[in-house]
């Protein structure tokens, strides 16, 4: 089991750790089920279960980008690093691959990376060739986009896991998508803590109903262990998660067990 755990995406490992924590808490402190859960049990135990779903959206994203191997050739060629490209960059790139946009970016940026020094990218002069950006294997086009996405969020490249911010002012994915990659200024992030579970669930479903996959952000037991991934479909209250590890462990996960902070 430990070997399987090591092969899982880091963001999924965080979810599994959350499952474990919640189960242990329930074992140690038995509690009455929430009304919503009790109703579901009553329904399934009634013997009158009918197949079918009221609402669902099949996975929208066909990209299965990965954090290692040849996917990182653009990063390696630029700065000599061929470790994990970072879940934030992957989530951004899979979203851009879905929309096939932009052909060119806006402006430029630079920063000094902790281990690899000064890095600069001119987004405006770049050509993002989505027609030659395969969904399941790395090409020079996807390698370039992954490198530029990482620089756009001032990626902290590290062999144990490369990190960057999803939301907030520069540098973040939220800022970069609008200011460097030309996405509409109406894009927004929603903090889960500002909504009831039902409200938040419906916000995500409405986006997916309108064929708009999202970037989700969540944290494990430590505030330092943040992760990003794409949510691109759902069946009832199970959401399809693309973890950004070459398709590994992509699947449907129950809403209440997804440890969101924003989307």
Regions found by a protein language model. Give the residues of each.
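Short, small-residue-biased leader/transition segments that mark boundaries at the very start
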Residues: 1-5
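A recurrent domain-boundary module in secreted/ectodomain proteins
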Residues: 29, 37-44, 182, 245-263
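Extracellular zinc-dependent metalloprotease catalytic-domain scaffold
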Residues: 34-82, 141
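Surface-exposed loop and adjacent secondary-structure segments within mature catalytic domains
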Residues: 65, 103-169
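Active-site nucleophile-adjacent alpha helix/oxyanion-hole segment immediately C-terminal to the catalytic cysteine
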Residues: 73-124
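Active-site nucleophilic cysteine motif
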Residues: 80-97, 138-147, 155-177, 225
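Solvent-exposed loop/turn segments at secondary-structure junctions
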Residues: 94-97, 102-103, 151-166, 183, ...
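Active-site-adjacent substructure of cysteine-protease-like catalytic cores
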Residues: 175, 179-239
